[in-house]
């Protein structure tokens, strides 16, 4: 039977901001003594972490990795750029990629519950609290992504600004086109397309754009309206759709043209299956 009341447990959680499981552990270790339980949690580096959780986190890093387990992305935010470049913080972020890949997770809450690959005696949430204690700032795991990498795929990753923006590109048709995939990922970070292709633009967005274009040419003859609208849609697709964009390193060719050229040279049926683009705070 526990040597503490639910009221004591509630008070410990309110004082420290630490999770229920660790608070119970602390009270059991302290034989129900609230002050001793707080000391126990402080020694673990957990108690003061809870007090930092209200602080704003505008800096941080987006990290990515691809290996035989799949591809993973994670965005982790802190208060200052100084801590964003701290080696302890970066080691924590790197461990999260391993955790995502090991457990095939894209959910931040689920990630927080698994045992950390960096410190197997602690959950990710507990290790985050210890890291907060070490670096002296609030840490927030904002989002996470995982997807398997299939046979016959080439994956390219490009990171810009020390992890301020990251893109991952998945090419099908070959396992030997990582350089092309990375070039396209670099292009995505620079050009920030919203969609893969014209066909992938949602119908409601097409209708919205058509309404905007039509209002801009109201009162003109119908054939003029159609011609102008077609031209505006072409410009919209060239700006918003990856495959229609001019390649940043060679504006004379579109991304689709770049892929077609590589496919012809290699004899492989290459295509972009999908891409992921994250920008810090977006």
UniProtKB/Swiss-Prot annotation:
Residues 80-83 are annotated as: Involved in Mg(2+) ion dislocation from EF-Tu. SUPFAM superfamilies: Elongation factor Ts (EF-Ts), dimerisation domain, UBA-like. GO terms for molecular function: translation elongation factor activity. Signal peptide: none annotated. It comes from the Bacteria. Pfam families: EF_TS. It is found in: Cytoplasm. One of its GO terms (cellular component) is cytoplasm. Belongs to the EF-Ts family. Associates with the EF-Tu.GDP complex and induces the exchange of GDP to GTP. It remains bound to the aminoacyl-tRNA.EF-Tu.GTP complex up to the GTP hydrolysis stage on the ribosome. HAMAP family: EF_Ts. This is Elongation factor Ts. It comes from Chlamydia trachomatis serovar L2 (strain ATCC VR-902B / DSM 19102 / 434/Bu).
